[in-house]
């Protein structure tokens, strides 16, 4: 059994050094997606969380709205996805339907050039039969 590493990322990031996305050792496909979204420099939460999460460590991150938390966990998730495996590999839980849809949209943008990666938001109020069918081939489930 492997020991889990847990790190808490919290605090005032206003004075923290940030990194450029090309310094984060992300794949060229994800880097292109990031650039298409108009970003060159990672936010403080991204600069701190992405390198730790890419090692496989478990993290808990806390930052204000609009600081890039979705990319902070989404980029490491995308780096770990095995495109050839066409079943769920990652489950992301969100407190609301709106956040699940928003997170799925952002992760799809990041994965724009990762052909063969399927991101699927699942939430209540939808036809369960359609959602079960949509699970086929999805590697990242967000609900």
Regions found by a protein language model. Name each.
Residues 32, 86-143:
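Conserved nucleic-acid-binding Ia/Ib motif block in the N-terminal RecA-like helicase ATPase lobe
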Residues 63-67:
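The conserved Walker
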């Amino acid at each position: 059994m492997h020991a889990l590493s847990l790190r808490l990322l919290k605090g005032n990031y206003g004075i923290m050094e940030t990194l450029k996305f090309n310094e984060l050792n992300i794949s060229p496909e994800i880097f292109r997606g990031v650039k298409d979204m108009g970003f060159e420099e990672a936010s403080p939460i991204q600069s701190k969380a992405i390198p730790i999460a890419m090692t496989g460590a478990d993290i808990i991150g806390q930052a204000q709205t609009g600081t890039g938390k979705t990319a902070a966990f989404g980029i490491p998730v995308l780096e770990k996805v095995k495109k050839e495996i066409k079943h769920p590999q990652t489950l992301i839980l969100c407190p609301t339907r709106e956040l699940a849809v928003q997170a799925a949209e952002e992760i799809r943008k990041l994965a724009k050039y990762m052909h063969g990666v399927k991101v699927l938001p699942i939430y209540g109020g939808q036809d369960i039969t359609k959602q079960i069918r949509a699970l086929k081939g999805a590697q990242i489930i967000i609900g």
